[in-house]
């Protein structure tokens, strides 16, 4: 509100303040009467003007003041509208009737400072009170949380106690349930024992009455008495279901018939025995209806209860042993089956690898093939650039060619690691592959060529060489001479190029000889092993002697080193040629050397690529014999030349 009152001062109030100031009124009166204003001894004179102008000046000032008042009124109205829109209240004009003196101003300023200080103190007190309230609230919240935690802990303890009590009750119930059947079983067993004892005693009495007749001899009396004593001490325990009544009746009837036929005097005794047997039968039916009975279908003199018990024990032991043996037998069979499955899987994998012997080893990687084809494309572009005399494109294409060759030779090192391996060499031997010692795709200088004088001496000394070799050498010399004439080489350039050519050829020949010797030694080792009757399989290599293994590994490593050194030699020659010749001359050399090499003995790469794609494109995996045939065809130089000529004619 204070800020709004300060800027919403009406023009009437401003004009009243000006009128109250006597100094301003005096200046205005002077200006109206004399046309001059005195302000701190600064005189303003208007003597050169006419009297008419003096009269017109106050009217202009009044008009300006009126215009100023109108503008201020418009601004005032706009401010009132803004105020009403902001605060939604009508504007009240401030009252300036009271004149403020300097003393009042000096008194008001410290009052304002005190008010500000009081306000700050009030604000500080309010902030402190708020902080205290917040602290109290935090303390109350912490106390409530602690109380809640204590209540939760008490509830958890109560729950645990209840669970423990429930578990104890359950255990007691289980124990009672387990004890009840055991008690019942014990009672039943005791009752059974009592009944069996009673039955045994009664049966013994009946047997004695039955067998101890007047006609029985003394020995039988003694045997039966001894048996009865043994029977009393060692009571039988059998699980065989028997019927004592029927057996006893049958025995008694047989004995009675015999006694009636032999002696008529024994009738009374037999009748007594029958009566006793009938009484026993009735009592036994009542007491032993639920008990298993003893089988006495044969002579009691032959019974031996010890043998019966031993037989049962033997049966239980034999059954246990049989079950254990059965489990062991099943485990052995399962282990054998697992071993057989593992062996079958291994054999399947080995068969698959044998079917793909040549593909994985001799198949060149797609990256290397793509790089070689790109080099050929670059050479074709160089031919066009030479025809068009475009030096910029020549420089760019030569740069691309050098970069691609460096990448290509780095990939060939990886392929060398694949081939120079005893297992891979063994597989190639099984497949019947004969590798060519020279696998160079592009030879810049065309083989064995020294200076012209050395070539003439060699031709004179070696008269036994074939005519084809002479023709090849003449062709090599002729294309190189033609290149010198076409490129317009200087004497220095031709001399440097000849020296570099001689050095390259000598190094290349030495490396070729060493590689051929190492190849022959490796083949001798494998051929000697094959002729000795030793199976050439990957497993058989593990059974070699350590000396042979070391020899083979050393020779293979040397062969690898020689191949890599030949690759480095080619790279060095490329870099040295670029330093001797200009870009146009270098491009022309690459084009001529490429044409000469493609017409000559170097293998054609499209043929290789087509062969490998034909092998891989088959739906079924190719057999071992198909791969061997293809590799032999590739190794035969005659067939390769025929295919090259055929493609070249196309």
Swiss-Prot record:
Residues 305-368 form the bZIP domain. GO terms for biological process: regulation of gene expression. It comes from the Eukaryota. The keyword Coiled coil applies. Residues 109-130, 242-279, 452-473 are annotated as: Disordered. The keyword Transcription applies. Residues 307-327 are annotated as: Basic motif. This is Probable basic-leucine zipper transcription factor K. Residues 242-251 have a biased composition (Polar residues). Residues 37-180, 259-286 form a coiled coil. Belongs to the bZIP family. Gene3D superfamilies: 1.20.5.170. Its main location: nucleus. Residues 118-129 have a biased composition (Acidic residues). It is found in: Nucleus.
């Amino acid at each position: 509100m204070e800020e709004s009152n300060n800027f919403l001062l009406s023009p009437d109030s401003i004009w009243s303040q000006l009128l109250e100031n006597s100094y301003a009124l005096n200046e205005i009166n002077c200006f109206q009467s004399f046309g001059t204003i005195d302000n701190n001894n600064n005189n303003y004179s208007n003597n050169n003007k006419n009297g008419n102008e003096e009269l017109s000046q106050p009217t202009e000032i009044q008009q300006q003041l009126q215009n100023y008042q109108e503008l201020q009124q418009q601004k005032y109205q706009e401010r009132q509208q803004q105020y009403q829109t902001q605060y939604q209240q009508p504007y009240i004009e401030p009252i300036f009737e009271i004149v403020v003196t300097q003393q009042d101003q000096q008194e008001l300023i410290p009052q304002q400072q005190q008010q500000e200080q009081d306000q700050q103190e009030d604000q500080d007190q309010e902030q402190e009170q708020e902080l205290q309230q917040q602290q109290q609230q935090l303390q109350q919240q912490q106390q409530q949380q602690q109380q809640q935690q204590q209540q939760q802990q008490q509830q958890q303890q109560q729950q645990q106690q209840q669970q423990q009590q429930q578990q104890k009750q359950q255990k007691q119930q289980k124990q009672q349930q387990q004890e009840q059947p055991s008690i019942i079983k014990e009672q039943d067993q005791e009752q059974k024992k009592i009944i069996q004892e009673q039955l045994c005693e009664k049966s013994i009495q009946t047997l004695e009455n039955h067998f101890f007749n007047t006609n029985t001899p003394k020995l039988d009396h003694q045997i039966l008495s001894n048996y009865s004593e043994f029977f009393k001490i060692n009571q039988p325990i059998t699980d065989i279901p028997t019927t004592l009544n029927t057996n006893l009746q049958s025995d008694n009837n047989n004995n009675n018939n015999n006694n009636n036929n032999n002696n008529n005097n024994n009738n009374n005794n037999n009748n007594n025995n029958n009566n006793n047997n009938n009484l026993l039968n009735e009592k036994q039916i009542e007491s032993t209806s639920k008990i298993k009975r003893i089988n006495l279908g044969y002579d009691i003199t032959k019974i031996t209860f010890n043998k019966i018990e031993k037989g049962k024990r033997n049966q239980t032991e034999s059954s246990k042993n049989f079950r254990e043996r059965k489990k062991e037998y099943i485990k052995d069979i399962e282990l054998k089956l697992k071993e057989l499955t593992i062996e079958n899987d291994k054999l399947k994998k080995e068969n698959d690898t044998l079917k793909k012997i040549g593909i994985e080893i001799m198949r060149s990687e797609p990256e290397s093939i793509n790089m070689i084809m790109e080099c050929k494309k670059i050479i074709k572009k160089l031919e066009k650039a030479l025809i068009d005399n475009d030096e910029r494109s020549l420089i760019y294409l030569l740069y691309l060619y050098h970069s691609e060759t460096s990448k290509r030779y780095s990939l060939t090192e990886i392929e060398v690691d694949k081939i120079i391996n005893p297992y891979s060499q063994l597989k190639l031997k099984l497949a019947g592959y004969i590798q060519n010692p020279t696998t160079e795709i592009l030879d810049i200088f065309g083989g064995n060529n020294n200076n012209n004088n050395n070539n003439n001496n060699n031709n004179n000394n070696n008269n036994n060489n074939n005519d084809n070799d002479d023709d090849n050498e003449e062709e090599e010399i002729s294309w190189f001479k033609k290149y010198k004439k076409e490129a317009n080489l200087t004497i220095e350039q031709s001399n440097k190029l000849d020296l570099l050519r001689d050095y390259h050829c000598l190094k290349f020949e030495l490396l070729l000889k060493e590689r051929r010797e190492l190849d022959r030694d490796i083949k001798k080792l494998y051929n000697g092993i094959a002729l000795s009757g030793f199976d050439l399989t990957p497993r058989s290599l593990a059974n070699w002697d350590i000396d042979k293994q070391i020899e083979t590994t050393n020779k293979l490593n040397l062969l690898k080193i020689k191949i890599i050194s030949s690759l480095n030699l080619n790279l060095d020659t490329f870099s040295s040629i670029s330093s001797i010749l200009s870009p146009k001359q270098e491009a022309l050399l690459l084009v001529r050397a490429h044409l000469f090499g493609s017409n000559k003995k170097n293998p054609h790469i499209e043929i290789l690529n087509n062969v490998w794609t034909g092998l891989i494109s088959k739906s079924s995996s190719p057999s071992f014999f198909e791969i061997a045939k293809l590799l032999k065809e590739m190794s035969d130089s005659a067939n390769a030349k025929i295919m090259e000529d055929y493609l070249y004619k196309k």
